[in-house]
Amino acid sequence: MVMGLPPGKGAGQVTEDPSRATWLQQARSYLRQADPVLAPLIDDRPDFDPRAWMAQLPPMDLYGALLFQVAGQQLSVAATRRTLARIEALFGGHLPSPAELLAADPGQLREAGLSWRKIGTLRDLAGRLSDGRLDPDVLSSLPDDELMAQLTAIPGIGPWTVQGALIIALGREDVVLPGDLALRKAVRAAYQLDHLPAEQEVLAIAEKWRPYRSLATSYLFSAAFERTADVPPSARP
């Protein structure tokens, strides 16, 4: 699970800047008018900082964010954090680079909590980054849809994984995670639906949030956090 960030801000970054305050004010005002359902979620949280949750994570580049997302597939946030801490311990207190992960003993990665399938996915991704088939600088400069197409070509990496990385590592401001079970439940509660919305229904609702879908999503996730001590697993890879 991820929370929306102002543009250009990734995990582990909490430095204040004037442009951020301006951006938040503009985005909140836009969302209040665009979707009355979001207005009380915004107004009831005047001190809500959409970067606060991210600040609990170590600084992540694109590979680190994808590692975090892959590790978190089908897991709660708490379980993902535990796995991440064990992985960091294997690499001297930091997330591994692609080269470091390729050099690691897969058995140790398994003991850290990664499934064999996830290890295979991460090694495949690390190999593509290490041998030049994928260039992280080029990837980071791509529009969301092109980056999605490049990364979802890798077995084990689906839209949910990439969507989270877009927010965590790149601070993309117009991202929504329609396959996330917690978000779908949050939408059901906020919109008082009598059913769990499917992905397409979430996307249809989220159209009115453009170009601030990441921030709108963060408010809904915040409401979900407040209703439960932990977050259920995502429904998507």
Question: At which residue positions do the language-model features occur?
Answer:
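C-terminal end-helix/capping segment
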Residues: 96, 179-207, 236-237
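Mid-sequence acidic-hydrophobic segments that form the walls
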Residues: 90, 125-132, 150, 154, ...
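Catalytic DNA-binding helix-loop module of base-excision-repair DNA glycosylases/AP lyases
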Residues: 71, 143-189, 215
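N-terminal polyanion-binding entry modules of DNA glycosylases/AP lyases
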Residues: 1-142, 146, 204-237
